[in-house]
């Protein structure tokens, strides 16, 4: 409610009017992009906007749509994150960026080899794997350059010179290089192709201007759970300044602005272990000044948004006997790696390396409902689905006169048509069978396949 959408639209239009940008682009979540286009059109009824529909990005229409962007002088091009990911990027630029990443990995490997006995095999193996992955990506790009045809329009040819990224935290998983592969909490250094694709696009614009310009990130959760996310913001938006400060990788940045400590923590099996983490920022005034150069920060209080106070209630639900039994098995599995304890085949060599991830995945599913692990488990009156259905029914009766509507979310066990047991369908079953709520009054958003159906 702080006005991000309108700010994006006004900023894009004013940049065009003042010749600060010739062809700006706005990208947003699929669920929000139609609202962004409508807001822009309402603010500027005479603006020439190109809004990408799902039909425009079908295989048959995509090439024509890309040529449309290239050959026309639009005030703004608006599309979703997913659609943006389908735009080809300049192979030559990809080659340069991937080669720079590979050079950094090779430098790190050389440093580790010189350290000799002080380096673990796991650390060396991690960097060698990263080197292999980058070499494979480079080969793929080199092949794309050799086999390229003239009819492919890439992002560079489209002439986009400023990009506004709504909900930019969706692209936070960008690749980075580090020798600290055993330090907890750094995230996945390999990153995602989605984030790498965004880096290619931003670098295309920055190379054209020769400045740290051309991209605006908008988000309510810029940094959520890792200090690497702050470094990656600078990697996206301030490459020239990082280079000026001779910061060419995460380790160089962390050496200046972060402090690593070793503390004792409880692990998954409830044992105390030593954990190495970057726990503190240092040189905070300098880091804050660096961050403020690229940031405009607003809270709902700053803007004066009138919002109701959140009434958050945490319900503590004790585990069922089956869950308590499974927790003990899970702890034994985490210690021994004996997968038969969980009713599955022994772990392969690859699975053995990911043992703790497997344990965490089982723990998440078990905490929601034992039937997430095996549908043959019995229902239990004290599981979360039962408690949830009971509370929904109570609110249903309480606000029946007002025809109140409730939203129910779960990050696991979402509804999939014809896909066996899931917690959404189980809650609906309990509401209809145990509490007499008409089935027609409980709907799944997943049943709505179009924007029109969702709004209805």
Regions found by a protein language model. Name each.
Residues 1-12, 16-20, 305-456:
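Conserved Helicase C-terminal RecA-like lobe
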Residues 7-10, 20-43, 48-49, 56, ...:
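Conserved Walker A/P-loop ATP-binding site and its immediately adjacent core
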Residues 15-21, 237-242:
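Post-Walker A helix-loop "phosphate-sensing" segment adjacent to the P-loop in P-loop NTPases
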Residues 51-62, 81-86, 411-413, 441-454:
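Conserved helicase motor
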Residues 62-107, 121-125, 129-162, 170-172, ...:
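Inter-lobe coupling linker of SF2 helicases/translocases
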Residues 89-97, 178-190, 276-277, 414-423, ...:
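Short, flexible/disordered intra-domain loops and linkers
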Residues 95-121, 176-191:
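A solvent-exposed, charged loop/short amphipathic helix patch at secondary-structure junctions
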